[in-house]
């Protein structure tokens, strides 16, 4: 950096500052040198120029940043400013005094307000006041004896029956109409359990199949006899889970004896006859 590019501080000649930092340095150095700041004056053409107050006029005459300025005319300096004649309107409210607690403000009433037109009137009668409802109307209080007499004259409501449990007041159909019989079967209720026996001996809501006339004659209600099992080698069949080594009633065992052994006494592999339940 060359020495010519630096600028000398007017408050301290030992300070050499770059031109880009010179305005910031002047503000900071002026605070540190208040005595020198009272002697120096600022040039009106360039704020970086600080000269003694006695030499300010000479500097302004020879400053390189001096520009031509138009002189102020005498007519312009003596021109009077026209004052406005506008005045604020008078205010009725007085803010200095306290509010009068006795006075009450008037209610706000709209001048163009018209009453609403009733539904059953024409457009010509819409401006007429509606006098059907009055604030002074009070319902007549009936004596106690007349109320009791009215209740006695009213018919008693019919008791609630189970046939009206599914009644819908919005529908025009009667509650739970009678359902026609299909093939001679009685219709069952909607929420009945098909596995619980109903009154009359019927077991399920669905009609039985195979041409039965009623639910009592259905195939599920009958008890079929157990078919006789075929005898194999003249032995009586026993239960599947019976102990094959215990003698069954009638002298037969559960396991088949293909070798012709009839009891444990004839079994050659058993050294001692076990105890057999009889």
UniProtKB/Swiss-Prot annotation:
Composition bias type Polar residues, residue spans: 149-164, 188-200
Disordered: annotated span: 149-230, 249-278
Pfam families for this protein: zf-U11-48K
InterPro entries: TRM13/UPF0224_CHHC_Znf_dom (IPR022776), UPF0224_FAM112_RNA_Proc (IPR051591), Znf_C2H2_sf (IPR036236)
Binding residue positions for Zn(2+) 2: 43, 49, 59, 63
Disulfide bonds: none
Subcellular location field: Cytoplasm
Keyword Zinc: yes
ZnF CHHC U11-48K-type span: 6-33, 40-67
Function comment: Involved in oocyte maturation. It is possible that D7 is required at a certain point in the maturation process and that maturation cannot proceed beyond this point unless a threshold amount of D7 protein is provided.
Protein name: Protein D7
Gene name per UniProt: d7
